[in-house]
Amino acid sequence: MRTPPAAFQAIVFLIGVAVAAPALAQSPCAKRGDLDARYCDEDGNLVADRPKDPKGWQNPSTLVFSYTPVEDPAVYENAFADFMEHLAKLTGKRIRWFPAESYAAQVEAMRSGRLHIAGVASGPTAFAVNLAGFVPVVAMQRADGSIGYTLQVITHRDSAIKTIADLRGKRVAHVSPSSNSGDIAPRALFKAMGVEPDKDYKVLYSGKHDNSIMGVVNRDYDAAPVASTVVERMQARGMFKPGTLRVVYESTPFPRTAFGVAHNLPPDLQEKIKQAFVTFDFRKSKLGAEFKDVERFAPISYQEHWRDVRTIQKASGVSYTQENLNKLGRKAE
């Protein structure tokens, strides 16, 4: 069963009623890579290993679930209702929704042991993996087998902007510094095209993809780099009329939101959670109604599927530190 309403859940969540266990450092650790000092990666798959000592595992009676704040969290609580019921049935646990208001808040919640299952946006996934012990398990898959989305640069249909070069001197909405399609990828890709954000055009952080999109619709911004999937869902919900926006540029695909678990959940519980994802039937579900292009949850590999995202982040000078996470939190909010 699941526990409404969102406001009450948020209060309970914040005062720490959710059962949590402190993250324990793996010691000694011969291989860590980019992971925070509290984690270890002995098997070399780039994600945190489960603690060898079962005393370091957390097995709460209530599992807390969150979805990336690409839009208002309230939009998705109802959409994930069917899935959370399915998750409760397969795990035998109570499921509580956590309405994360920023990427940083979501990462910090898992790092502190207060969040156990999450859908994390593509860009922040690397922060969640390295700072919070997040282990990506599945992603939403289309009928054609793809799990990706693209970076789209959108502008109003009446705008004179036709190319990336036309962004010079304009007011452009970026999402937040941790967003792959909303900031990190544009900075790397646009510079290669001869246009440097902050130098050639004014960057205005909107905080969320929907804010950027509606800002362009309402002509508060001249353009915005955003995730194609968010544009598609908002148009399908009637948030703006077809033809209102024009796509100036579209990238090759990136992996979409990673769904996964805290690294220190017991192995049998992690397996039950994975099975809840892969056995969920999107047909006639609220989740299927919201994500109309999705057929199922499919297994993923952070090491493989996030290779290009990590490359762009490294080339952009991104480092996965608590200090940078705090900066992202302030920007995102």
Task: Please place each PLM-identified region on the residue numbering.
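Bacterial N-terminal signal peptides
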Residues: 9-19
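N-terminal hydrophobic or amphipathic helices and topogenic motifs
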Residues: 21-105, 289-333
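Pocket-flanking alpha-helical
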Residues: 98-133, 231-236
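Ligand-binding "clamshell"
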Residues: 128-140, 234-248
